[in-house]
Amino acid sequence: LGMERHNVGNVALWNGDIKQWSAKIAALPMVTEALPPSYFPIIPTGPMMYIEINNWDDLLKISEESLTIGMMPAKEDFFEFYGLKLLEGEVISDKNQGNDVVIDENTCRRFGWKQALGKSFYYEWNGQRSAYKVVGVVKNFSYRSPTSKPGLIAFQHPKAQEYLLNRASILFKFREGAWNECREAIEKLYKDEFPNAYMRLFNEEKEY
């Protein structure tokens, strides 16, 4: 399915400081890996930001109908965490600008591109035009249910979505069979530390 979702969980806190949990979740004995809260889980959240575009390189005439692209923050550790496979170019790192993007094959095909590196798609808002330049392409991965059509998706540096990151999640992996134990430990942290916040805690395999 193009991405890792087995033994993968994620937790977010609204009205609570998730940053305080980074080290605590990573230190849980059943957790094998945890990423800092700079990202959103592919499942079930997906993109928290969408843009409408109607123009991209090699388009013969500007399309009447606009395409919706989901924009997700991501850096090397995110691509590695989910096992997303790079087909060409590079993944997003700190040397990239906020408008550098990695897209998947499906988005590349929708633009009619055989080769996407260095090409751009354009977003217009209030008469201002922004260009997003493709620096990498990853293999398709299915993050929606098998019956629904895959969305168009682009990954960009988290600095481009800073205003959303107070809602970001800690993504983590846990030992085989340890989900219930893991969930209980995180629920206890929640009750002890942020009882008035709203917690979202998911096992990505169960949500798919």
Regions found by a protein language model. Give the residues of each.
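Short, solvent-exposed hinge/capping segments at secondary-structure junctions
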Residues: A74-E88, V102-K119
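"Rare, low-scoring activations can occur
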Residues: G16-P36, E105-N106, Q128-Y208
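A short, compositionally biased
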Residues: T45-M48, W113-K119, L165
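Membrane-proximal extracellular/periplasmic loop immediately following the first transmembrane helix
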Residues: L1-L60, E65
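The feature marks short, hydrophobic/small-residue-biased sequence motifs that occur predominantly
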Residues: Y50-E88, V135-G136
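Beta-strand-rich non-transmembrane domains
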Residues: E64-G70, G89-V102, F121-N140, E162-L164
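Short, well-structured beta-strand/strand-turn elements
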Residues: T32-L35, K85-E90
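Activation segment
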Residues: Y82-G83, N96, F111-G112, W125, ...
